[in-house]
Amino acid sequence: MKGFVSECSLTYAGAMPPRAAPLSPDDRREALIRATRPLLYEHGTRVTTKLIAEAAGVAEGTIFRVFDSKDDLVDTTIARCFEPGDVLVRLDEIDPELPLRDRMLAMTSILQQRFLAIFELMRAIGAVGPPRHLHDRPEIVHGLEEVRRRLLALIEPDADRLTMPPEQVLHVWRLLTFAGSHREIADNDLLTPTQIVDTVLHGVEKTPERSAR
């Protein structure tokens, strides 16, 4: 019997995968933020450290080695959600050689997805707007300015075709994209990127050319 136990022990010990190398504190924080983010959409700020630990594949105590409290982790994750994230990368992937309408359709799709995600998060955490303390965070302020700069760069090449300056076109476009992506403002009838772009570029008045389409 002893030999059997010993043999089994060796067999299972040999089958066990090697233990993963421990993460640095910064990497552990990032892993916990990634695990917490989808949980906020599902549970809001009521999410528990048990759920977070399970999602991250760690013990609950691990959370408190890199965050002061659950609230600290939740607040950090919410702040991360308001950073531009991959929006900048996706805007940079838009081909500047595309026609103006196609460029604007692409940027509208990207920003609408961003707005929808932010609005869904605010509903989940019971907020009516971004937390006030986020307005002055350098990474968010700088990130939003970079988003604006990239959006403007996608419109400016066709400035001579527009009836108003590109900055004003961008302003009108952002207002319509924001409102048309907000379920309450839009009465649950969200505008599509095509509706938004065609309204900004062509208005709603019929013309012989458009009527013939």
Per-range role (PLM):
Residues A35-L39, T76, I110, L176:
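Short amphipathic alpha-helical elements of helix-turn-helix/winged-helix folds
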Residues G57-F67:
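Short hydrophobic/aromatic patch on the recognition helix
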Residues M1-A55, D71-D72:
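Basic, helix-initiating cap at the start of DNA-binding domains
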